[in-house]
Amino acid sequence: MCKITENIPNGARNPAYLPEDFDRPMVFIAEAGDIVGTRIGVKTDWYCLCLDADAHHFNKEHPIFHGPFEVNISVELKPTPSEAFRFVRTDGQPLPDSLEMWRVQTKGYKTEEGFRPGMIARPWGFADSPDAEYISGGVSAKDIDAVAMGRHGNFFFWGFSASPENMTDEAQTVFANAVAYISKFAGQTPIARRYKSDIATREYAVQQKDFISYKRWQERMVVEKQYIEKTEEIKKVALAKQAKGEKLTSEE
């Protein structure tokens, strides 16, 4: 794939892989949504490279869960990701203690050391234009509304990182359905583009107001303290192992 480079206002050269009039259907896997998409205004930007193995808040009525290949989605009630409670919801609704989840991958980076994490996109803008769809969220370190699967124009975003061999059988089928689904958008392009990921939207403003509150500062200090304590523990173990001439792990 070749790069198209153009001058941008700050004098740097920003690489692009596709022209803005590209109208062929395409599926973005994980961070490819950001690397390839955002340069041409696709809303699949890099919110966090922290998507794990489960999906939640998925639209069960969406076509990718119904065909062309038949699939029966297995759901399980699991605890709401703890990180999600750090974010205020723009609809003002409290988060439940547990969520209905669907297993997409057989492995995830949280339980499998060295496994590649997926990427989630910012949710703002997936519901305010006819060319975009929110399809599913996923377990991550960000808010509950972050996008793990979605569509913008002729681009389908599959934020999960696993190759087919590490997908569940159900996910393999849904992925095939997603490829078939996005093919219907051949000849179309995004209508409302977003070139700046943190552009001030109503949702972003609400979230930022919450972030600067004293309550959130206190919570952040607790997290920072826990991180420092964990780091010191790892350091202590690593130094002891090093003194004995033992091999250190990648984390150490």
Model-derived features: positions:
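Helical hinge/lid and interdomain linker segments adjacent to catalytic or ligand-binding clefts
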Residues: M1-T38, R216, R220-V222, Q226, ...
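Solvent-exposed loop/turn segments at secondary-structure junctions
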Residues: K3-P9, A32-V36, E70-V71, S140-K142, ...
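A short linear-motif detector with a strong N-terminal bias
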Residues: N7-I8, E112-F115, I135-G138
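Short, structured coil/loop segments at alpha-helix boundaries
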Residues: I8-P15, E61-V71, S82, M167-T168, ...
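A generic local structural motif
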Residues: A12-P15, I120-R122, D143-I144
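Extracellular/periplasmic catalytic domains that process cell-envelope and extracellular macromolecules
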Residues: P19-F22, H57-F58, A127-D128, M149-R151
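An acidic, glycine-rich "communication" segment
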Residues: F28-S129
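Extracellular ligand-binding/catalytic regions of CAZymes and related secreted enzymes
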Residues: D128-E252
